[in-house]
Amino acid sequence: MTVNSSRNALKRRTWALFMFFFLPGLLMASWATRTPAIRDILSVSIAEMGGVLFGLSIGSMSGILCSAWLVKRFGTRNVILVTMSCALIGMMILSLALWLTSPLLFAVGLGVFGASFGSAEVAINVEGAAVEREMNKTVLPMMHGFYSLGTLAGAGVGMALTAFGVPATVHILLAALVGIAPIYIAIQAIPDGTGKNAADGTQHGEKGVPFYRDIQLLLIGVVVLAMAFAEGSANDWLPLLMVDGHGFSPTSGSLIYAGFTLGMTVGRFTGGWFIDRYSRVAVVRASALMGALGIGLIIFVDSAWVAGVSVVLWGLGASLGFPLTISAASDTGPDAPTRVSVVATTGYLAFLVGPPLLGYLGEHYGLRSAMLVVLALVILAAIVAKAVAKPDTKTQTAMENS
C-alpha cells in the first residue's frame, strides 16, 4: 500500500468514526428531548420515570461489561456493525412501547438500546484510540464532538417536531429508520481486526499490577464517574429539570437542552487544541470547575436567562471528561480494549446509578436540589484531575514495546 493510499484509507476511517459517533448522539437526543411527552404518554411520576430510565442503565452496563471480550473475540468492525444495528432495533421498540403505552416495554427498549450502545461505544473508542495513535495527534475529543453534534442535531429536530405537534412515537421511529443507511455505508471504511486477540489484561495492569491496585487507573475512574454523571444527568433530566424546576414549556425545555449540547459540541471540537497546548490535567480541571459553575447557577439562581447561559457552561464543563479519560486509560498499558472497558464501565456506573437516584431525590426534594449530587461529584473530579496526566516518554515507550 502506498503512502497516499494509506493516508486516504486513514482519512476515510476517521470520517467513518465521525459518523459512528454522530449517529448515537442523534438517536439518544431523539428520545431524550421527548422525555416530557414520554412521561405523559406513559402516565408515570418522576420517580417512576427514573425506574423506566433504569432500563437504559442496566442495558448499558450489560453491554459494556461484554464489550472487551467482544472486541478481542470479533474485532471492532464486527462489533460496531452488529451493535449499531441492534441500537436501531431498540429505538423501534421504544416507538412501539409508546404506541402501546407500556412503561415496561419502554424500559425493555431502553435496555436493548443501552446494551447495543454500551458495546458499540467501547468498540468505537478502541478504534478511535488506534486512529489517534496512527495520526500521532489528539483526535478523540473531536470524535466525541461528533457525538455532541449528533445530540445537537437531534435536539434541534426534537424541538421542531415538538413545536409542530409531531407525536413522539412517530419521531422516534423515523430516527431509527434514518440511521440504517449511514451504518452500512460507514462500516466499509473500518478495517477488520482492530482490537482482535489483544493481550489478555483483564486481571492485571501495567507491570502486572492488578487493576484494583492501579491507583492511577482508579483515580481516572473517579474522574470519568463524575464527568459521566454530569453528562448523563443532563441527557436524562435536563428537559424535565427546566420544565418542572424553572417553569419552562416543553418546547423551551428542548431548546435549553440544545444549549447544553451546543456547549458539549463546542468543547469537544476545540478541546484537542487546548489539550495539546495546556495538558490533559489543566483541561480536565478547568472543565470540571466550569461545569460546577454552570450546575451551581442552575441550582441556586431562579432566572430563565441565567439558566440558558448556565446549561452552556454545564455542557462545556462535561464535554471533555469521557474522551480524556479514555485517552488516559489507553496510556496505562498495552491492552487497550480491556483498559477502555474498565474506565467506560466505571463511567457507566454513573448512568446506572444516576437516573433512579436523581429521580428518587427529585421526587422528595425537587430536581434542582437533586442536582447537588452532580455538583459535588464534578468538584471531586477537579480535585483528582492529576490522574489523567500523560506518562513520561520512557514509560510510554516501554508500554508501546510491550
Curated annotation (Swiss-Prot):
Periplasmic topology ranges: 35-48, 101-103, 162-164, 231-252, 302-304, 363-366
Subcellular location: Cell inner membrane
Alphabetical list of CDD domains matching this protein: MFS_MosC_like
Cytoplasmic side: 1-11, 72-77, 127-138, 188-207, 276-281, 328-339, 390-402
Membrane topology (UniProt): Multi-pass membrane protein
TM stretches of this protein: 12-34, 49-71, 78-100, 104-126, 139-161, 165-187, 208-230, 253-275, 282-301, 305-327, 340-362, 367-389
SUPFAM superfamilies in UniProt: MFS general substrate transporter
Pfam families: MFS_1
Domain of life: Bacteria
A GO CC term attached to the entry: plasma membrane
Protein name, per record: Inner membrane protein YbjJ
Organism expressing this protein natively: Escherichia coli (strain K12)
